[in-house]
Design a protein with these regions (language model features):
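Conserved catalytic/switch belt of AAA+ P-loop NTPases
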Residues: 97, 150-163
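Conserved coupling/interface region of RecA-like P-loop/ASCE motor cores
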Residues: 184-216
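Charged, amphipathic alpha-helical linker segments immediately N-terminal to NTP-binding catalytic cores
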Residues: 1-8
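A short acidic, amphipathic alpha-helical/loop segment
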Residues: 46-50, 148-155
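Structural recognition of the conserved hydrophobic beta-strand(s) that form the central parallel beta-sheet
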Residues: 139, 161-167
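Conserved P-loop
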Residues: 34-108, 173-192
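N-terminal pre-P-loop "Q-motif" helix
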Residues: 12-29
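Conserved RecA-like ASCE ATPase "motif II neighborhood" in helicase/translocase motors
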Residues: 114-151
């Protein structure tokens, strides 16, 4: 089923472009949606909005590619990861959710009983778990290697909805050829439970759009 009829998607539904509508409908129609999206296209915000409507616990995961490994930075796991989840925080504000109460926290475990529905972890700490009855958002997927994506995706049960978000023109890995994003797009493209979509309209403005068009 696509986006439920008469659901305004936190006010986004009337303003969705054709590309965004296909993206949103795919999340409700398929177990796996892979989106190759430019900057400023609303990819993470729409994914989080859909996850809220789907109603399953959300696991939001990412690659701390700037550090290479979170283990070498000071602080708790939660403190190390906090600077990487800004797209999630922005998305929650857009759907009028308070991140302090939506995201599970080691510092405040009681909020789980108060409606916290999101676990935010780097792929390093997620990949050893079984991912059941959840929505899994893999953000910045272009910065995960084939091996890292494989370790994540092989943990997913059939009861989980997966949204794999990336931009194949913004790979931050030292060796871009190691990115698993494009190979996994082609690997899953023809599977009946998967849909691959693109988002190309940058809503931040002409400057951001033009900057994103530079290739090397």
């Amino acid at each position: 089923m696509p986006l439920p009829e008469h659901n305004l998607l936190f006010g986004f539904e009337p303003k969705l472009t054709d590309e965004q509508r296909k993206y949103v409908d795919s999340i409700f129609d398929n177990q796996l949606t892979i989106v190759n999206a430019k900057s400023g296209t609303g990819k993470t915000t729409l994914a989080v909005a859909c996850a809220k409507i789907v109603g399953k616990p959300l696991i939001y995961t990412f690659s701390p590619v700037e550090e290479g490994s979170l283990g070498f930075t000071p602080g708790t796991v939660e403190e190390k990861e906090s600077k990487y989840i800004q797209p999630l925080l922005d998305a929650l504000v857009e759907i009028r959710e308070d991140p302090r109460f939506a995201i599970k926290s080691e510092k405040n475990p009681d909020i789980i009983n108060e409606g916290a529905w999101i676990t935010a972890k780097s792929h390093t700490f997620v990949r050893g778990t079984n991912i059941k009855n959840s929505t899994l958002i893999i953000d910045e997927s272009q910065n995960l290697t084939r091996g890292e994506l494989k370790k994540l995706l092989t943990r997913v049960h059939s009861s989980t909805t997966v949204i794999m978000i990336g931009h194949d023109k913004q790979i931050d890995l030292k060796d871009p050829k190691k990115s698993g994003f494009r190979p996994y797009i082609e690997h899953f493209r023809d599977e009946p439970y998967c849909n691959v979509v693109e988002l190309n309209i940058n809503f931040r403005g002409k400057l951001a759009q033009h900057a994103d068009n530079l290739e090397w």
